[in-house]
Amino acid sequence: MRFSDNLAKILDKYENLGNKLSSGIMGDEFVKASKEYAELEDVVAKIKEYNKAKSELEEANNFKLEVGLDNATLEMIEDEIYTLENSLPKLERAVKIALLPKDDADSKSAIIEVRAGSGGEEAALFAAVLFNMYQRYAELKGWRFEILAISDTGIGGYKEASASIKGKDVFSKLKFESGVHRVQRVPETESQGRIHTSAATVAVLPEAEEVDIKIEDKDLRIDTYRASGAGGQHVNTTDSAVRITHIPTGITVALQDEKSQHKNKAKALKILRARIYEEERRKKEQARADSRRGQVGSGDRSERIRTYNFPQGRVSDHRIHLTLYKIDEVVKNGQLDEFVEALIADDEAKKLLEI
C-alpha cells in the first residue's frame, strides 16, 4: 500500500470512529471506540498538517504557472514554495514516527535498580552517584521518586539501590539507561593521583500493575528473617526482613529497609512484579526477532553503554557516539535530557528504516 493510501485509510477510520461515538453507543463498545479514537488523535493531527502542506505546495506551483505575474508576486510564490518543500520531509517523518508501533510499557512508571560492579568501594561510591543523578533527573521532570531499598557500605557507597519513579511516560525516557555505566576518576584515597576505572550496572523496569501481572499466592515462597546492618550484626529484634521467591521463574527479591515486615513485603512485591513483567516482555520481543528491538544497542545489561570521565569532564554514550563536556551538569544536577532525547531519536531512526 502506498504511503498516501495508508494515510487516507487512517483518516477514514478516525472519521468513522467519531461518527460511531456520536451515534449513542454505550458500554464496552463505547469504551473500545473511545480508546481507539484517542490513540489516533496524535497521528491524525500530523497527517492533516502534512496533507495541508502538500496541498498548499500544489496550489503554489499551479499559481506560479499563471501568466502575467509581476516580479514581486513571483518572488513571494517562490519563497513559499521553497519553505513548503523544506518542511514536507520533516512533516512526513513526523507522521511516520507517529505511525511506529508503540511499546505498551512506554507510558508506565518505572523501577530503577543500580548495583555496584567491578571496582570495589569506588564502584559502590559511583553507584551512589548514579542513583542520586537519577533522583535529580526525576525532580527536574516533576516525577515522584520513592526509594525502595538501599544497601550501603557505611562510607557513602551503595552496593545496590532501587527506587520507584512515578510519572507520565517515565519508562519511555529511562529505558535506554539499562546497561553498564563506567567511571574514570581519581579516588579520594589515591595518593599518587592515578585514575581508577570502575563500573555500576543500571536496570530500568516498567512498573507493573496487578492488571499487568497476576501473581498467585501459591507461586510465592516468603521467608522472613532479622534485618542485619553493616558487618552482619542484627539491627532488629523481630523478623522484619523479607525474601520473596517467585517459584515458576525463580526470581527472588529480598528487602529489609523498613522496620515493618508488612512494608518490606509490599515493596518487595512491587519489585518482583516489575521483574516478572520485564521478563515476559523480553520473551515476547525475542519471539518476534532474533535480536531485541525497542532498545538501543542489544539492550543487554552487560553491555557498556556510557563512560563518565571526571578528569576530562566528559560523559560519552558509546551507542550513539555522543560526548558532552559537562559532567557536573549531568551527574550532579541530573541534566540527562540531551542523552535521553538523542537516544530516543536514534531509536526512532532505526525503526523508520524497518518501515
Curated annotation (Swiss-Prot):
<dbReference type="InterPro" id="IPR004373">
    <property type="entry name" value="RF-1"/>
</dbReference>
<dbReference type="InterPro" id="IPR000352">
    <property type="entry name" value="Pep_chain_release_fac_I"/>
</dbReference>
<keyword id="KW-0488">Methylation</keyword>
<dbReference type="GO" id="GO:0016149">
    <property type="term" value="F:translation release factor activity, codon specific"/>
</dbReference>
<dbReference type="InterPro" id="IPR045853">
    <property type="entry name" value="Pep_chain_release_fac_I_sf"/>
</dbReference>
<dbReference type="Pfam" id="PF00472">
    <property type="entry name" value="RF-1"/>
</dbReference>
<keyword id="KW-0963">Cytoplasm</keyword>
<feature type="modified residue" description="N5-methylglutamine">
    <location>
        <position position="233"/>
    </location>
</feature>
<dbReference type="Pfam" id="PF03462">
    <property type="entry name" value="PCRF"/>
</dbReference>
<comment type="similarity">
    <text>Belongs to the prokaryotic/mitochondrial release factor family.</text>
</comment>
<feature type="region of interest" description="Disordered">
    <location>
        <begin position="282"/>
        <end position="305"/>
    </location>
</feature>
<dbReference type="GO" id="GO:0005737">
    <property type="term" value="C:cytoplasm"/>
</dbReference>
<comment type="function">
    <text>Peptide chain release factor 1 directs the termination of translation in response to the peptide chain termination codons UAG and UAA.</text>
</comment>
<keyword id="KW-0648">Protein biosynthesis</keyword>
<dbReference type="InterPro" id="IPR050057">
    <property type="entry name" value="Prokaryotic/Mito_RF"/>
</dbReference>
<dbReference type="InterPro" id="IPR005139">
    <property type="entry name" value="PCRF"/>
</dbReference>
<feature type="compositionally biased region" description="Basic and acidic residues">
    <location>
        <begin position="282"/>
        <end position="293"/>
    </location>
</feature>
<protein>
    <recommendedName>
        <fullName>Peptide chain release factor 1</fullName>
    </recommendedName>
</protein>
